[in-house]
Structures are given as structure tokens and as C-alpha cells.
Amino acid sequence: MLKIVLRWLLTLVYRVKVHGLENYAKAGNRVLIVANHTSFLDPLLLGVFLPDDITFAINTQISERWWLKPFLRLSKVFPMDPTHPLSLKALIHHLQSDTKTVIFPEGRITVTGSLMKIYDGTGMVADKSGATLLPIRIEGAEYSRFSKLGSVRQHWFPRITIHIQPPTLIETHGEVTGKARRKHSGHILADIMTEMMFATSHYQQTIFAALLEARALHGGRYTVAEDLERKPLSYDALIARSIFVGKLIKTLTQTGENVGVLLPNSCKTLNVVLGLQIYQRVPAMLNYSIGAAGMAAACRTGQINIVLTSRKFIELAKLEDEAATLAQHVKLIYLEDLATSLTSFDKIIGLLQAKTARFWYKSQDYDADDAAVVLFTSGSEGLPKGVVLSHANILANHKQIRARIDFGPGDVVLNFLPMFHSFGFTVGTMMPILNGMTSFFYPSPLHYAVIPEMAYEVGATIMFGTNTFLAAYAKKAHPYDFYSLRYVVAGAEKLQETTRTTWLDKFGIRILEGYGATETSPVTSVNTPMDYKAGSVGRFMPDMLHKLEPVPGIENAGKLHVAGPNIMKGYLLPDNPGVLVPPCSAAFGEGWYDTGDIVHVDEEGFIHIQGRSKRFAKIGGEMVSLTAVEQLAIHAWPEAQHVVVSLPDPKKGEQLILLTTRRDANAKQLADASPGVATINFPKKVFVLDKLPVLATGKTDYPGATALAARLLEGGNADSD
């Protein structure tokens, strides 16, 4: 009777909903229920809303607390001392009696809002007892007054949902025993819990709908964005201004039209992007570092007729010539001109629409699979293509990242990566504003002395960058400039050991290396504080599938193909403008994206990149990794920059060319510094340069480097092997 009353009361107060009760019925009789631990309400919620008479495995000390005893009478309790190994054995025997038992594998209430440490012992209990695992996510209770989250806006009566996931088993290899088996089962359990967190997240919606949810959760006055103008934007202001801009652009464009955006990292750019999305226009982010011809080509590929820009930006960035040339191909619309047409009445209506957006926006016909943005690939390995990402792609990647790392309210992201780059768009911009974080926009990553000062000034806690940029900042920064940083994540190019050790020694910060591509929205994998292996790029994001295509001449690695909810909607190709080409791997078919990277995935699931498939040379019938040869040069001369490319060779098929900034570099020195390395792995020619070709994103410009090497080879003046 008490259980019925409490169920009615909790449903009334917290509007509790239970999803997946059919999974509970499928689990059988011997069941270990594993749940995330969000608040002091969790045992009560599970005891009241789960069928049957379940048992709670609970810490002996906690079970003795007076305020908890009345609630424990609702269910059976299995007290256990986590410091005593016999407690786990007793729990195994208890489960083998065909009972349904609840345990919280984190061992404590979360203080991050994300999963905390998962104890291996819980996985071992499931493994050795033969019990079915039933993962359950409690969502919403972390925002109640009964949680331990100090950085979030707490509510008296938040909406709570209990997600019951499909039952599963922990299956370990028979040859694994002892501590290794315990660790392995704990590893499997952690993956199950992480997959649960993602599977129960809501990413099948539009970005603006997710933004409205974030405002409801964190409050309309919460500061979510800021730039060099130092006029912080709250959720209310961001939504209102985005509606203002969107309504003005709506009259000039058509539904579904790709609209060019030629603007720097700023709050105004964020307003433009969201404004376009609200009214079902697609922002196409133009890379202003590639010149007028490159931008015009991108506009042709994306069938872009209108480009939004700013006179102030064009002047400050000295892009007058590029703008004049671009204006011959498309219509340039300046934000300053749009602003003059905004009347007081428009502002009043816009403010009302912003306040009531959660009502009128839901009634609109929006699809999460509609295009949300067009990003143009950097062209590091060929001609740039338009990559179309849907709302669901971007939100899925956001939720995947959140399932792995505890980014959350209170964090300040210093975002200097341009929004025309997928890293800067999804991770630096969209993830923070949808997650109650504050994104501070800085217009250029190339200001190596200024950015450390900005990190110090704004108290940045999160920073994303490439190896090139992070290495440059480390040289310029004071040891205390990055005092407030919790996490620094590197991607887009290989993190060099010198950069890793410099950050650790000078700032006490361990860089987390990740991996991805524009086509994966962009994060494919990342090292995390709890799942880290130096030299790797981390483990795959939740709900991502992968296959390795064998490559002749390469052992213990293959070409990586991936599939998942964050895989792009499709390409816009230069030879077929405006026509969407869905992802399709030649090896594995539709829905699979061929990354073109040669990788090794170890037994723990960590990815080790060997290089691009195009970054291998075939010399005398042997496959040689250009990336591996670059690493030899980096090891020999860590203070310099190096690029290795391959060019045709009449005798051996291909030859290696090293471009370096090391003044006295030559092939003999490199060979002397690399004992035991086969001669085939050394460059045939070495050219010394003042600087190497680099793209605006910080990645090496390999096509540019190859073309430069060909010109230098033709002209001579190189050190030979």
C-alpha cells in the first residue's frame, strides 16, 4: 500500500515516466540491475517504480543512516562492505539464488553530472554469478534538490525519467583469469553504462529545440556566449537575437536554401547560424583563408547565391579584394545593412517570440535529419568538398562526447578554432551552448601570444586545439596562464610527444588526444580522464561501428570505415553541384564512411593511427608510412617542423622527400639518429625551408607541400641520401 501511495506522490511531484518496462520482463529471474547514481532519490525511485520485490546492495555504513531506514523498508537490503572481498562473494551467492538485485556501480552520487568511476567489482559479480545485466538510467534527478551537483541550476520538482535498457550479459574470454578477468569485466560494464547514457539521450531533434531545452534547464539569464566585445549573451538574449536575424534573412531566401556565412568567431556569427536554422535555412560556413577563388568554388559546389558577411570584419581581416571578387559570383549581404531595417516593432515581436518559443516552435514541421550546416573540407588530401551535417548528426556527437567526458555547467570554453572547421563548429560552439557551458569566441588561432593571455583572463576551463597551435601557445605562455584549465583536447593532426611533454612539464596538464573528421561531425574517438592511453587517439564514441579493410603490405592494421548516428548526411561534390551524395563505402556499402586512415585497434579498443592510406609510399614493392618517417625526423630534431611527401621515382616507383625547418638537416644525420631503421624509411632528398605549408586550421597542407617538393626537386639544391 505504501509503495502505491509513494508511486502516486512521486508521479505527481516529479512527473516520473518509466520507459522500457518490457526489458525488465525480458531479463529473467537472476538479474543484476546497474543504475547511474544521480541523487539521494535514486533508491526510492527504483524501489517504487520497478516491479517485484527487488534487493538493494548497499554500503553497510550508508544503510545505518537514520534518515534512510524508513525507505529501505520498501525493499530488501543486502548490506555489504566494499572494503571486504568476502562481501562480493556473498553478493554473487545471493544472485545465484535467482534474485533481482540493484547496485550503483559508481559507488557514490555523481558530482559531475556524468558517469563517474565504474568499479570493476560490479562487473566481476555479474560475470561470476551468471546474472543478466539490466542497465537503467535515471534522468532528471540530478537537477533536484537531492543531488550533489553544485554547478547546475537545481529545481524543486524536475521531470524524472527512468530508462530501462535491453538486458545484456558480461562475457569474458575463458582464458582470462584472476585480476585480469576482473579488470576486463569492469571494462565491459563501463562500456555498457556509457552506451546506456548515449542510447537514452535525446538527439533526434533540431539544434534550436535542444537550445530551448538547455534554456529551460539552466535558466534564461545564464551566460552562454561571449566574445571580444565583452557583452555576454544569456540564453534569452541569444535566442531573441537569433530570431531577429533569422526573420530578416527569411525574407531574402528560400526554405532549405544554402546561405553562405563569411564571418569570424563571434556572438554575432552564432546568432546568424542559429537564425538561419530556426527558419530552415542552411548555414554554409566559408573558409576565408583559402582566398576568393576557393570561396567562389565552394559557393558553386553548394549552390550558394547569397553570402552573409560584415563590413567591419572585411575591413579588419583585410579581405576587401576577396570580397570584391566574390561579389562577382554571389550576392553579398552585410549585417550592418540588415540591422538598419530592424524596427522597434520587430524587436518587440521578436522578444515575445523568444519568450514563447517553446510553444510555437514545437508546432512547426521540423525534421532532425534536415541539413543543419554545410562545412567544406580543408582539402588536406585533395579538392575541398561540401559536407552536409544534419541536426541529428551534430546533436548525436554532442551526446556521445557527454557520455564520455564530464563537460558541463560552470565550464568556460575558449574557442579560437574557426566555425568553418568542424572542430570549432560542433565542439567549440554547439556543444557548450547546448550544455550550459560558456563559449568565449576568439577570432583567430594564430595569435600565439594573445591566446594564453585570454585563457588566463576569462578563466577558461576547456580548450580544444591542434598540435600546431598547442605547441605554439606553450612556447609563448607564462606557466600560470593556463591555471584554470581542466581539460585540453587535441585533434585534427597527430599530437607530438614534444607537445605532450611540454604541456605536462610546464603547465601540469595532460593533453587528451582525439580523432575525427568533418564527416563524423567531427569526433570519432577521444582519450578521457578515465580511459586514457598515451600515443593513441582514444576509443570509439558510443554507438559507433567500425570495420578495418585489409591493405596489402600492411600488417596488424587496416583502412578504417565507420558508421553511426554522427556520420554525415552526405557530400556536395564539385563535379555535381548541389546534389547530395550519401555516405557509401566501396568496401562495406551505404551508411559507412571510409576515413582513408590506416589504423590499429588494440585489444582494449584504443585506436592507433598509422597514417593516411594516401600517406603511404610504395618503394621497390614495400609499403612505407610517410607519417612514420615524419616521426623519425621529429625524434631527431624535435624543435623543428617536418613534412614528408612522396614523388614518382623512375627506378623504385616512388621516393621520399623531407621538407624541414631544421637548418643543418640532412639524410645522414637522420639515419644516425635512427639506429636500427631500414634504409628504405629515409628520405632520398631533404629540403630546408623557413616555414612549411599549413592550412588555416593548423593542419599540414599536404597538397601544397607535395607541389612545393616537386618544384624544389626540379630546381635541385637539396641534400641527397
Please describe what each predicted stretch is.
Residues 395-412, 420-462, 476:
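Conserved AMP-binding/adenylation subdomain of ANL enzymes
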Residues 331-336, 617, 645-648, 657-661, ...:
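Conserved C-terminal "lid"/linker of ANL adenylate-forming enzymes
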Residues 332-335, 339-376, 383, 406-412:
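Conserved pre-ATP/AMP-binding loop-to-beta segment of ANL
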Residues 539-543, 552-586, 622-624:
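Conserved ATP/PPi-binding loop(s) of AMP-dependent carboxylate-activating enzymes
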Residues 335, 350-352, 460-465, 474-533, ...:
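Gly/Ser/Thr-rich phosphate-binding loop
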Residues 307, 564, 569-570, 596-681, ...:
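AMP-binding/adenylate-forming catalytic core of the ANL superfamily
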Residues 251, 278-350, 459, 657, ...:
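Structural core segment of the AMP-binding/adenylate-forming
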Residues 508, 532, 566-596, 613, ...:
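Conserved ANL (AMP-binding/adenylate-forming) active-site segment centered on the GW(Y/F)…HTG consensus within
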